[in-house]
Regions:
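Active-site-proximal, substrate-binding regions of enzyme catalytic domains
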Residues: 1-77, 84-182
């Protein structure tokens, strides 16, 4: 994960700011870098990237950083995932198959045996999304300490900001949050 968040982006001009920020968080002790078990990571990569097939070819679904995060969280932790593909793979693998079929415009099959084995890695993981953290911050009044404006407007702005930064939130999801909380 450190490689994907800090090391690789440092070499790409338009992504250089985030690695500087995360490096500072690690140095100050706010974030900790942990090493994942290589065997567990390899097992997760093997299963996840041989679970779905299109035209008799396996589909690469996750990368090493995601597998490392899963390996670390598989011991009863919580995993923050904004990326739809991995979240669907963990929570609703059948929906991921449908999404892949839609995106690829071809039939996709799922190896049920590998899905069951993969699911064993995920049984003890609690999944949360950034939008859920924003919702809790809104409910507890934390957002109003940092942002000026009407409460509902601040919530909406935060949710759209997450969406524009890669959180897999649809406009319907945002409307649902606003209806429930605003």
């Amino acid at each position: 994960v450190q490689d994907e968040i800090i090391n690789k982006p440092k070499r790409m001009g338009h992504h250089m700011m985030a690695p500087l920020y995360f490096t500072a968080l690690v140095k100050s002790g706010v974030l900790q870098v942990q090493e994942a078990d290589d065997k567990k990571v390899a097992g997760i990569l093997d299963l996840s990237n041989s679970m779905y097939y299109a035209h008799h070819h396996s589909l690469t679904i996750i990368q090493r950083g995601e597998a490392e995060a899963l390996a670390l969280a598989s011991e009863g932790g919580t995993l923050l995932i904004d990326e739809r593909t991995l979240r669907f793979m963990i929570e609703t693998p059948q929906d991921l198959m449908s999404l892949l079929q839609f995106r690829m415009r071809r039939d996709v099959t799922m190896n049920e045996e590998k899905r069951k084995l993969f699911q064993k890695y995920c049984d003890n993981i609690s999944i949360i999304r950034s939008s859920e953290i924003v919702a809790v911050a809104y409910e507890k009044g934390i957002l109003s300490k940092y942002f000026e404006g009407e409460k509902r407007e601040v919530l909406e702005a935060c949710l759209y900001s997450l969406k524009s930064r890669g959180c897999s939130l649809s406009t319907d999801d945002i409307d649902d949050y606003l209806r429930m909380l605003g």
